[in-house]
Structure formats: C-alpha cells, structure tokens
Regions:
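Hydrophobic structural segments
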Residues: 1-256
Length: 256
C-alpha cells in the first residue's frame, strides 16, 4: 500500500527538497507520512476550495507547488486551508522552488509548452548549482508582438504584457513565476526575449531600455504547466493510486 512518505520520497528524488531556496517552505507541510494513500489531488495552490474538493473526492493527500504555509501563521480559522486540511485529515506535500529548479520541472515544462528547442541553462542558482532560468530557440524568428501572442496562445492566457524589443525573437529565455530577477542582457546573453510570470514597473522599463522583449504572462499560467507532468510521473510510479488535477486549481485574477 502506498503511503504519503512514498510519494514524498519519489518527489524528493526528482526535485530534492534540499535544493529549495533559502526563503522557501517546501516539503511535507501537513499530515502524517505513514498515512495510506489511494487518491491524490494536484494543484498549484492549496486554497480552501481545493481542500474542499479533495475532501469531496476522498483524497488523502494534496500535492501542490506553492506552500500552504509560507508566512508565519498569525491565526487559524475554520475557513482557512490549514484548518480544513487538519479537519479532513488530508496531508499536504508542497514542492516549490525545488520543482522550479529540477530537470523536468516547472521551467522545463514552460520551455516545452512554448515550443523551444535546444533548451539549456541561462543562469544558475548558486547554492544548488541548478539552472534558475533556461533558454532555447523558436523554430523560426518572430516579431515581438507576434511572439507575445504566441506565448498568450501557448499558455491559454486571457492577456499578456510585453515590451517591444529591438530585434526579432529567435532565442528565448524564461523563468516561471516571479522570475524577472533573471532577466538577461540581450547583448551578452544572445537572448532576444524573456518570458516570466510577474514583472515590476522598473523591470519593464529596464527591459525596454536594453532592447529586450519581456513577456509577462501571469504567475499562474507560467507555473500551472507543470501539473500534467507531475500527474504523469506520479501515475507511472504509483499505478495503484488515482492522481487528478484539481478543478479548483485556477488563477485568482481576471482580465477585462
């Protein structure tokens, strides 16, 4: 019989929790590793709606990307996700920055969804020695606006923001989520565009000033691409367990 700890160990082999960034809170964040598992729900975030969905389908475990406990808890109320996890005796494993960095993880899945070839490291996370950003080539060059539309369609976004770089886009860098800190200089990196989930105003100005096409596609959309990969890997490793992506796993924002 599969236990929570077996799924934790599998994820730890793929994306070691020891490689998570220092600010992170990844790992088994709720529940008992010895509990048996027949049904697992996958989600980007463990929201109250996700926990309620897990309870309704009889799941014993939720595997998420974002930690259900990140900032210090200041209150625990009946409508909060941690309370609901405890109430329904549902365990939570959260694979965050360790899954961003892992081969086959979030950034790899984002590169695949964008159709990039010759995918390789763009920059390295010093503590882990793993790539924090990747780059690769498009099949053919695109003008900046055309590339932004390509990203929008590939990630099924309602909208994207972008800066118009000074050159057609063939080589693309990327870092999922809040990854604008990895934004490269096109003159030294050979990258004409960079895709991420979030960027601050001054980062958009910086991209424009160096002639980089910066495409901001939304935190959720640049990271949710990993959920099918997690489901596929876990389903192959544990065929006796049912893995499904939560219907309640969605972006909280809307575009008008």
């Amino acid at each position: 019989m599969t236990k929570v700890k077996n799924i934790y160990e599998f994820l730890n082999e793929w994306a070691p929790f020891s490689t998570a960034m220092s600010f992170d809170n990844a790992g088994l964040l709720a529940g008992n590793g010895e509990e048996e598992v027949q049904t697992v729900l996958l989600a980007l975030d463990i929201t109250p709606d996700v926990v309620r969905e897990a309870a309704s389908c009889g799941a014993q475990l939720i595997v998420s990307h974002h930690p259900v406990i990140f900032d210090p808890l200041k209150r625990l109320t009946p409508d909060s996700a941690p309370w609901l996890l405890a109430r329904h005796a549902i365990a939570a494993i959260c694979a965050h920055t360790n899954l961003d960095l892992a081969p086959g993880g979030v950034n790899t899945c984002l590169a695949a969804r964008l159709g990039l070839a010759n995918v390789r490291p763009l920059s390295i996370d010093p503590p882990s020695g793993l790539p924090e950003a990747l780059c690769g080539e498009l099949p053919a060059a695109m003008e900046p606006r055309e590339f932004a539309l390509h990203v929008k369609n590939a990630l099924d976004c309602e909208r994207v923001e972008f800066t118009k770089g000074s050159a057609p886009v063939r080589t693309v860098g990327l870092c999922s989520g809040a990854g604008a800190f990895c934004m490269p200089d096109p003159q030294t990196s050979g990258v004409q565009a960079f895709v991420t989930g979030e960027a601050k105003h001054h980062e958009l100005l910086a991209a424009e000033s160096i002639g980089l096409t910066l495409v901001v596609a939304g935190h959720y959309h640049t990271e949710a691409v990993v959920l099918p990969e997690v489901r596929e890997r876990l389903s192959k490793a544990f065929p006796e367990v049912t893995f499904s992506i939560a219907a309640a796993s969605r972006t909280p924002s809307h575009a008008v």
